[in-house]
Structures are given as C-alpha cells and as structure tokens.
C-alpha cells in the first residue's frame, strides 16, 4: 500500500509562454514572468486588424496606439500588466476566444517592450547628458532591456524568428506545474509511518 496523494486538481497556469507556431511544435515554450515587469500586453481593438495580422496582411507595428487594447491596464488599472498569473491567463484566453488572437492559430496576445525601451532610453540620455534623439533613445533603451532580458529575447528570436526589440513578442498561457503531491501531516510525515516528504514532493509546499 502506497502513501496518500492530495490536491491533484490544482494546476498552475503560466501566462507568459511562446505560443504554438506550427504543426511541428509539440509544446509551448515557457518564458519568464519577469517579462511582465516591463512588457505591455495588448491585442488590436478592431476585429479586422486582428484578422489582418493573423493572415499576415498587417504587422503589429502598423497598428496605431489608439487602436491597441491594453486590456489588463484597462480592466485592472491599479495593477496593470502585473496582475496575478491566473488573472492574466484568463484575460488572455478570453480575448483570444473572442477572436482577437494575433497568431495563425488565434491563440496569442502581444507583449510589447517599445514603451520600456523608450522610457529607459530617455532616462539614460538624461543621466549621461546626451541629446535624446529618437535613435539615441532607442539604442540606449535597448541596451538596458538587453541587460535585463537578453537571454529570453535571444531564445524567443531563435524559436519565432522575429526580433522582439523591434516587434512585440507573442505570448499565450500554458499549463505549468501540477500542484498536488504526497499527503503529509504537520510534521511532514506521509501516511506511511516514518516516511517523510519535504518540499515540492508534498501537496502543500509547491
């Protein structure tokens, strides 16, 4: 007789994954949640723009600011893009289910770093006393973003074949860890006397 298992129904959902991009891809690729510190999540406001992007008749950079729906910032102004992962995941799926998804499968939203690049670039120009021309702002802003997320951007570009410094990333939620584990008491002992489960092996500590 084995040890009892608990909480098999609890599953983490990770909102920041590279979506499926073709028939050859067997699973979604996990990206770091840290990207939401600086990236702004959006989909087109107009259905015709979403369709045009899916059909590759439009690029995301061609969608003007006023035609972008930063839906997390709109729905949760106090938290914006830093809402809890379950909220971000549900909101992304809702937008995609409503027909606003932006990749070929309709299961992706944009994670855009243009605002962060501009903000960091202006800060760096001010710090170093440099004229904040558009080119200088972008160059210095991209350096800061590269220092923070360069390895993730490199991984994304290798998989998707698009430069995330210039074009918004595409992301979509994916199932992550199963939260269940071996049942333990307050002393971390399982239902097998003398057998203990410590850390993520037990049901309560993941």
Write out the residue ranges for each language-model feature:
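Flexible domain-boundary/linker segments
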Residues: 15, 204-205
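An anion/pyrophosphate-binding glycine-rich loop and adjacent beta-alpha core
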Residues: 4-155
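Residues forming anionic-ligand binding surfaces in small-molecule and nucleic-acid pockets
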Residues: 1, 112, 200
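A conserved FAD-binding loop/helix module that cradles the flavin
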Residues: 1, 205-206
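Short, glycine-/Ser/Thr-/acidic-enriched flexible segments
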Residues: 46-49, 77, 116-118, 176-177, ...
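A glycine-rich dinucleotide-binding beta-alpha-beta segment and adjacent secondary-structure elements
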Residues: 145-203
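Short coil/turn connectors at secondary-structure junctions
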Residues: 2-3, 36-38, 105-107, 160, ...
